[in-house]
């Protein structure tokens, strides 16, 4: 594997982990600033090597999946996020891109508003009556929070006024004013309850209560900033006009909204808001800048995960100085050993900060960090900050070097660092308690075996009490044994046992993904399952045969081959099957027997489609005998190029591969 491939894999794994913590668990471990840094690094690397972009990369999607504790609502119109800029130069570059795409030399009229630091929600009104509400979730599916949203007094249960559409889905931010946040924490300290780190966490925790009566006691509020569904009615043709119409119908809208007719006016708005930020009474982390004209918005369109006509201009992260008192080492699912700085506690932007990730040995070397050093900590709205630099001019005399362990701090196994990789790994595998915990958490996760109710804390206890050593042990658990865990009553224990029983019926692709084979994400697992059809065929495959699977190269093929060559892994798989884990037998499709122009061809989709979603297109292509790959190579037979097709199209043309557009694809699908 090339070094850049390893960097991309590690970055994507890290970002997905933090997206899960932020969007699903409402328990972020890093700051927005650190997440943004990682995302920028990933974008920059993918820009260098667009052929390595994967469909499941965090740059290609929004956010993370919802919890199953709530019912789920599928967004009819996806809830996209915004791209970010962090300085004036980046904003001016964004402004120029917009003007260039519009082929205009005239200034764009921008609508500027506050970037609230709360929880994004959608609220659906039918004939003016509130009928449902949902969180953003993963942008496609969110959690049904209707009962809780109905308790927020700022949100009208019925719109008032004239010309209300038959169906109107408004989008906005639920947040907690500073005074309400302080009162919640004051009450929590007095009663021994949970003290929240910041207003955003408090708002998320309040809104996602299973008991709406608790939500009703929290002083949440709401500002509307956009629209999703619009049926049976009309709205003004400008963004500001729509906000004013929402206000006329009784929906709360921020009064800090301004039209700006030049880039300089936008910058002035940004700096004025930044200056007033401490006195607003609620948290913001930047300003949002949108093209005011809806016609121009439509002309500009979207990229994969964000509109081209809007951007979030984020404030600089806030910084403080403190001392590194120690460095500890944590072990992840794949054995990656991550150094964590233990800091002299310091208040940064209203939050007491006591630790920060140092990523890897290369980062420590880059910083020139030693234990005892005075460092600059940067934080911008999250819980765990980043170490920006070392204050060498104030280095104490008693500092000492940070020594990476030669043995795993958890299990004592040897550690290794493969040449060209940034990560040091424990070689202990499942004998390592830390890896065992993380592997089991991955195994039961929603996108893997999807065991409802089997949370991280339960896994931690099961491993620590030595009830569970391998995934197969999970299916041997009884309600009686689970009842002995902390905060686990008989009913909850039985629910977990029932969920485990339900999870036994899965798919071959989910099962492969759940095994946690290194470098095998959901897309690769699906490709392996589709290509080989059966577990027996996959286990018997050679490295050369594995490389025939679309998107599987020598590195992934080697990891898969080595995994199945390991006797202990085969033993665990045998135990899982013996415990009743199963999936439907494969439906064998002979491409030669399918009367379709796509039969037997390896197809790559690139660019955005306007007539159907990418997932729908993939499903229809596969049904017609095609193999859909994520990157263009000599194995590719056909490339389907949608709007704004980029490097994949260029590579296809370079290799002389047949290229068709979306209209031709639709014609052939109907052939």
Curated annotation (Swiss-Prot):
BRCT domain boundaries: 593-671
Function text: DNA ligase that catalyzes the formation of phosphodiester linkages between 5'-phosphoryl and 3'-hydroxyl groups in double-stranded DNA using NAD as a coenzyme and as the energy source for the reaction. It is essential for DNA replication and repair of damaged DNA.
A Gene Ontology BP annotation from the UniProt entry: DNA repair
Obligatory cofactor(s): Mg(2+); Mn(2+)
PANTHER family on file: CHROMOSOME TRANSMISSION FIDELITY FACTOR 18, DNA LIGASE
Catalytic reaction annotation: NAD(+) + (deoxyribonucleotide)n-3'-hydroxyl + 5'-phospho-(deoxyribonucleotide)m = (deoxyribonucleotide)n+m + AMP + beta-nicotinamide D-nucleotide
Protein residues bound to Zn(2+): 408, 411, 426, 432
Organism listed in the record: Salmonella typhi
EC number(s) per entry: 6.5.1.2
Similarity remark: Belongs to the NAD-dependent DNA ligase family. LigA subfamily.
One GO location term (cellular component): cytosol
GO molecular function, one term: DNA ligase (NAD+) activity
Principal EC category: ligase
Keywords associated with the record: DNA damage, DNA repair, DNA replication, Ligase, Magnesium, Manganese, Metal-binding, NAD, Zinc
Active site per UniProt: 115
Listed name of the protein: DNA ligase
Residues given in the record as NAD(+) binding sites: 32-36, 81-82, 113, 136, 173, 290, 314
């Amino acid at each position: 594997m090339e070094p850049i491939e390893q960097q991309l894999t590690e970055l994507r794994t890290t970002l997905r982990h933090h997206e899960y913590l932020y969007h699903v668990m409402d328990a972020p471990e890093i700051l927005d600033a650190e997440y943004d840094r990682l995302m920028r690094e990933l974008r920059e690397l993918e820009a260098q090597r667009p052929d390595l972009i994967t469909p499941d990369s965090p740059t290609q999607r929004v956010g993370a999946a919802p919890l199953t504790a709530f019912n789920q609502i599928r967004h009819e119109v996806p809830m996209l996020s915004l791209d970010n800029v962090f300085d004036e130069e980046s904003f001016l570059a964004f402004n120029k891109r917009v003007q260039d795409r519009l082929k205009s030399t005239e200034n764009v009229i921008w609508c500027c508003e506050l970037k609230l630091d709360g929880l994004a929600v959608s609220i659906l009104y039918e004939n003016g009556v509130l009928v449902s509400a949902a969180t953003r979730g993963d942008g496609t599916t969110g959690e049904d929070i209707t009962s809780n949203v109905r308790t927020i007094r700022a949100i009208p249960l019925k719109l008032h006024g004239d010309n209300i559409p038959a169906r109107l889905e408004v989008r906005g931010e639920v947040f907690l004013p500073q005074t309400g946040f302080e009162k919640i924490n004051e009450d929590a300290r007095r009663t021994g309850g949970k003290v929240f780190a910041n207003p955003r966490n408090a708002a998320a925790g309040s809104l996602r209560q299973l008991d709406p009566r608790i939500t009703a006691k929290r002083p949440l509020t709401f500002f509307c900033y956009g629209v999703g569904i619009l049926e049976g009615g009309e709205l003004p043709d400008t963004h500001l006009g729509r906000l004013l119409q929402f206000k006329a119908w009784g929906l709360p809208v921020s009064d800090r909204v301004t039209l700006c007719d030049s880039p300089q006016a936008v910058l002035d708005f940004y700096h004025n808001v930044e200056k007033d930020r401490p006195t607003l009474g609620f948290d913001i982390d930047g300003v949002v800048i949108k093209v005011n004209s809806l016609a121009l918005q439509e002309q500009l369109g979207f990229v994969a995960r964000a509109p081209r006509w809007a951007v979030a201009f984020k404030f600089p992260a806030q910084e403080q100085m403190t001392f590194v008192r120690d460095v500890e080492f944590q072990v992840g699912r794949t054995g990656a050993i991550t150094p964590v700085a233990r800091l002299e506690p310091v208040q940064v932007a209203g939050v007491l900060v006591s630790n920060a990730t140092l990523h890897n040995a290369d980062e420590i070397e880059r910083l020139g960090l030693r234990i005892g050093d005075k460092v600059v900590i940067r934080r911008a709205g999250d819980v765990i900050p980043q170490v920006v630099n070392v204050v060498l001019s104030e280095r104490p005399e008693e500092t000492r070097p940070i020594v990476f362990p030669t043995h795993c701090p958890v299990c004592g196994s040897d550690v290794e660092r493969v040449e060209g990789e940034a990560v040091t790994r424990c070689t202990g595998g499942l004998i390592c308690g830390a890896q065992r915990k993380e592997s089991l958490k991955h195994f039961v996760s929603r996108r893997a075996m999807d065991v409802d109710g089997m949370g991280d804390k339960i896994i931690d206890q099961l491993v620590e009490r030595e009830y569970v050593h391998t995934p197969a042990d999970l299916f041997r658990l009884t309600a009686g044994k689970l009842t002995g865990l902390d905060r686990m009553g008989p009913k909850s224990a039985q629910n977990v046992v029932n969920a485990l029983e339900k999870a036994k019926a899965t798919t071959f692709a989910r099962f492969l993904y759940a095994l946690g084979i290194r470098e095998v994400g959901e897309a690769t697992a699906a490709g392996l399952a589709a290509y080989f059809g059966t577990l027996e065929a996959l286990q018997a495959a050679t490295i050369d045969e594995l490389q025939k699977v679309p998107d599987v190269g020598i590195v992934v093929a080697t990891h898969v081959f080595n995994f199945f060559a390991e006797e202990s892994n085969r033993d665990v798989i045998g135990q899982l099957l013996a415990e009743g884990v199963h999936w439907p037998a494969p439906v064998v499709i002979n491409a030669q027997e399918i009367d379709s122009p796509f039969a037997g061809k390896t197809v790559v989709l690139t660019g955005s489609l306007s007539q159907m979603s990418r997932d729908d297109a993939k499903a229809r292509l596969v049904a017609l005998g095609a193999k859909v790959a994520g990157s263009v190579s000599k194995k590719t037979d056909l490339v389907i190029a949608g709007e704004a097709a980029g490097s994949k199209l260029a590579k296809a043309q370079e290799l002389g591969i047949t290229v068709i557009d979306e209209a031709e694809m639709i014609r052939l699908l109907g052939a």
